[in-house]
């Protein structure tokens, strides 16, 4: 027998049922019991899908109303004391307030789950944090699954990863010090699961794939010795998102009953564990991407393992299937429009079926599933040989780029003189980050056009009307460098993906980003080409309305890559450079059209960093090259801007400087300009625009607040190189607050200009 299991399942439902129910509940349009009933039905469906595919264990406890790390904070009594809630008697409303904030307390901070596009709620640890076991979340789900007749495997994030993912708050201390009192609470929680008749428990320790300090790594031995001794169940330690080869000796000696390895992200690590003498769960189906596996190739890896391990071989996805859309079968439009691409994809339900086929092949031989294996091989061969994917002219263009194609003609010191000469901007020039409010009217017009209820001419006229409004409002405010407001863009990545060859879009390919927020990433399936200009006519039209400088707006290659499902048949670095080269055609067309200030947004550069620091340089090198390629060939007097909206720059500042953008705008208002200090210490050489107010809030900042931030900025950045702008795009704001916020920004800027003149 070969055991097949999954590490976790999507929570939101095939049609985002949980999202819509949550949002109705928050609007007080749905009763609590109705939300609980819907969640129960979703869990039952998830288990049935696994059971129908002959999974041997159902993943239990992975379902959450918001986030699995928030559930663990509740289960360990580690919810922030500042809310004043009792974790043992927490109501559903209070649970959501932890995630979303309330009138007295801001929400728990959210950040990326390792290097995925999912976000978790960051535990807040204080020196005096007291943990208390509250296993209700897991126990209830075990009982539900058992009533439905399922064999269960509860899933819980392990104590070291849980602590690692948190942050110290209040008095200075190291959260590692809390481990000794956290472990007994885990023992209590796990024993509550054992009391429900649980045989196996999956404990996730993805922190093993990052650069852990030595004391953390060493702690695994004692922690798992305690859990093994005091919990009467078999423990499966799950690692994923990267290689754990460096910990192979430690992991093989841990007193656990099984180990899960991610053999998609790090297939090379298998060699280090082939002599493992307990259960080895092989993560062979990609839990993070949407490509169908070549099952014959996977069996070539599994069959020798099966021979060696026998029943100790388990098979699974590489990680939780939370990161993949639910069901490919509902993508009838994609099947009709691009049947070849459709045949190369596998969503959650298809991945579970792939594992089912592998299980049968390992138990009964390949002949027992030859129809399925043949279909898998046909799809793999068709994809490898498709002319739609592989366009020789793209590879040729990349191979024949001139030497130093990604370098500007002259250094910044020379370029800026040429730019200043024609721009003729005042001291502390002002601009916005790009988007302006997306009103209901804009969204309605876009939806009507997509449905065919609005002609192209009618749609374009409504967008032009909106662009004119945005231009006139900026002129009234007396901003220096204007933008067209991006009314025609639904999303900063999807908009470009729809206009570039090599991209496709699903209709129901949603994945959870956090809570009720889901995203539908584009699919990059082939070589990337820009068939025609994408933004030129809009920017050109906007420029025709004003004598002021108009800024062109593009999303950068790294961000497009990071926020998409990316093809896995060529390196990500190659895909990124293809996007950069395609964007360079757009940049040169904008320049030809008279748009000589062009912003290339890269909010995702940091989140693309590999988990291990040893791999950072390679990534930053190709990411930087792709960004610079996107503006290759521009004249020295064309000014390239970039925008980044994240909070940690210190450790990658040399790479940010190496992008060589003439102007960088960054999100700094919420950190009280602290981020800017790093730029000052580093002596960042080019122009910089730190955000002077937080656009994520409708609140209008006071003149004193903006002046305080600008004066702090002037202490770090020479006045000749300082720009003034909001933190981020204004798409989500209303018009009245947008105008009021920008008015304050402009009045403070003018006051300081007069003072500095």
Curated annotation (Swiss-Prot):
L-homocysteine binds at residues 433-435, 486, 601. Pathway: Amino-acid biosynthesis; L-methionine biosynthesis via de novo pathway; L-methionine from L-homocysteine (MetE route): step 1/1. Binds 1 zinc ion per subunit. The active site is at 696 (proton donor). Keywords: Amino-acid biosynthesis, Metal-binding, Methionine biosynthesis, Methyltransferase, Repeat, Transferase, Zinc. L-methionine binds at residues 433-435, 486, 601. Zn(2+) binds at residues 643, 645, 667, 728. Its EC number is 2.1.1.14. It catalyses: 5-methyltetrahydropteroyltri-L-glutamate + L-homocysteine = tetrahydropteroyltri-L-glutamate + L-methionine. Its cofactor is Zn(2+). One of its GO terms (biological process) is methylation. GO terms for molecular function: 5-methyltetrahydropteroyltriglutamate-homocysteine S-methyltransferase activity; zinc ion binding. 5-methyltetrahydropteroyltri-L-glutamate binds at residues 16-19, 112, 517-518, 563, 607. InterPro entries: Cbl-indep_Met_Synth_N (IPR013215), Cobalamin-indep_Met_synthase (IPR006276), Met_Synth_C/arc (IPR002629), UROD/MetE-like_sf (IPR038071). Belongs to the vitamin-B12 independent methionine synthase family. Catalyzes the transfer of a methyl group from 5-methyltetrahydrofolate to homocysteine resulting in methionine formation. NCBIfam families: met_syn_B12ind, PRK05222.1. PANTHER family: 5-METHYLTETRAHYDROPTEROYLTRIGLUTAMATE--HOMOCYSTEINE METHYLTRANSFERASE. This is 5-methyltetrahydropteroyltriglutamate--homocysteine methyltransferase. It comes from Histophilus somni (strain 2336). The lineage of its organism: Bacteria, Pseudomonadati, Pseudomonadota, Gammaproteobacteria, Pasteurellales.
């Amino acid at each position: 027998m070969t055991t097949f299991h999954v590490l976790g399942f999507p929570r939101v439902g095939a049609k985002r049922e949980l999202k819509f129910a949550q949002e109705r509940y928050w609007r007080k349009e749905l009763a609590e019991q109705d939300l609980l009933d819907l969640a129960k039905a979703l869990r039952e469906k998830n288990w049935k899908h696994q059971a129908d595919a002959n999974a041997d264990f159902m993943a239990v406890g992975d379902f959450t109303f918001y986030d699995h790390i928030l559930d663990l904070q509740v289960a360990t009594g580690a919810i922030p004391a500042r809310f004043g809630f009792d974790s043992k008697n927490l109501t559903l409303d209070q649970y959501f307030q932890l995630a979303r904030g309330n009138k007295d307390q801001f929400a728990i901070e959210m950040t990326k789950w390792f290097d995925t596009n999912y976000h978790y709620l960051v535990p807040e640890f204080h020196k005096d944090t007291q943990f208390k076991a509250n296993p209700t979340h897991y126990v209830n789900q075990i009982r539900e699954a058992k009533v439905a007749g399922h064999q269960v495997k509860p899933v819980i994030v392990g104590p070291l990863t849980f602590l690692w993912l948190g942050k110290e708050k209040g008095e200075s201390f190291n959260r590692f010090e809390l481990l000794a009192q956290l472990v007994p609470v885990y023992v209590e929680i796990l024993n509550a699961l054992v009391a429900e008749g649980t045989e196996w428990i999956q404990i996730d320790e993805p922190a093993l794939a990052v650069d852990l300090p030595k004391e953390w790594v060493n702690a695994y031995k004692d922690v798992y010795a305690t859990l093994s001794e005091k919990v009467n169940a078999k423990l499966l330690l799950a690692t994923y998102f990267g290689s754990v080869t460096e910990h192979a000796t430690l992991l093989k000696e841990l007193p656990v009953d099984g180990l899960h390895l991610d053999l998609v992200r790090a297939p090379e690590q298998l060699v280090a564990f082939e002599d493992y003498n307990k259960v080895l769960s092989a993560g062979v189906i990609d839990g993070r991407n949407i490509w169908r596996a070549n099952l014959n190739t996977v069996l070539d890896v599994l069959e020798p393992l099966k021979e060696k391990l026998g029943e100790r071989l388990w098979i699974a996805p590489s990680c939780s299937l939370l990161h993949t859309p639910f069901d490919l079968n509902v993508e009838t439009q994609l099947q009709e429009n691009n049947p070849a691409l459709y045949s190369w994809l596998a969503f959650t339900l298809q991945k579970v079926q792939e594992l089912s086929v592998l299980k049968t092949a390992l138990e009964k031989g390949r002949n027992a599933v030859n129809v399925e294996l043949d279909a898998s091989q046909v799809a793999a061969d068709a994809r490898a040989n498709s002319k739609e994917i592989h366009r020789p002219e793209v590879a040729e263009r990349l191979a024949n780029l001139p030497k130093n194609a990604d370098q500007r003609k002259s250094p910044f010191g020379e370029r800026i003189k040429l730019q200043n000469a024609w721009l003729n901007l005042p001291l502390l020039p002002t601009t916005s980050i790009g988007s302006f409010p997306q009103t209901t009217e804009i969204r309605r017009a876009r939806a009507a056009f997509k449905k065919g209820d609005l002609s192209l001419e009618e749609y374009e006229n409504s967008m032009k009307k909106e662009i004119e409004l945005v231009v006139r409002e900026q002129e009234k405010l007396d901003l220096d460098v204007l933008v067209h407001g991006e009314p025609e863009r639904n999303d900063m990545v999807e908009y470009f993906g729809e206009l570039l060859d090599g991209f496709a879009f699903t209709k129901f390919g949603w994945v959870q980003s956090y809570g009720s927020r889901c995203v539908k990433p584009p699919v990059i399936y082939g070589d990337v080409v820009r068939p025609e200009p994408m933004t030129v006519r809009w920017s050109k039209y906007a420029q025709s309305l004003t004598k002021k400088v108009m800024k062109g707006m593009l999303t950068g290659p790294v961000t497009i890559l990071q926020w998409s499902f990316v093809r896995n048949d060529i390196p990500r670095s190659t895909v990124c450079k293809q996007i950069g080269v395609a964007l360079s055609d757009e940049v040169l067309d904008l320049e030809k059209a008279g748009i000589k200030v062009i912003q290339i947004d890269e909010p995702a550069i940091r989140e693309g960093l590999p988990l291990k620091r040893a791999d950072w340089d390679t990534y930053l090198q190709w990411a930087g090259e792709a960004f610079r390629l996107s503006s290759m060939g521009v004249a020295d007097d064309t000014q390239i801007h970039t925008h980044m909206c994240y909070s940690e720059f210190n450790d990658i500042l040399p790479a940010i400087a190496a992008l060589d953008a003439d102007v960088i705008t960054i999100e700094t208002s919420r950190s009280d300009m602290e981020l800017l200090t790093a730029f000052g210490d580093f002596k960042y050489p080019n122009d910089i625009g730190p955000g002077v107010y937080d656009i994520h809030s409708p609140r209008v900042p006071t003149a004193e607040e903006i002046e305080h931030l600008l004066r702090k900025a002037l202490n770090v950045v020479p006045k000749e190189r300082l720009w003034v702008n909001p933190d981020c795009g204004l798409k989500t704001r209303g018009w009245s607050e947008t105008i009021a916020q920008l008015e304050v920004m402009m009045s403070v800027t003018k006051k300081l200009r007069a003072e500095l003149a």
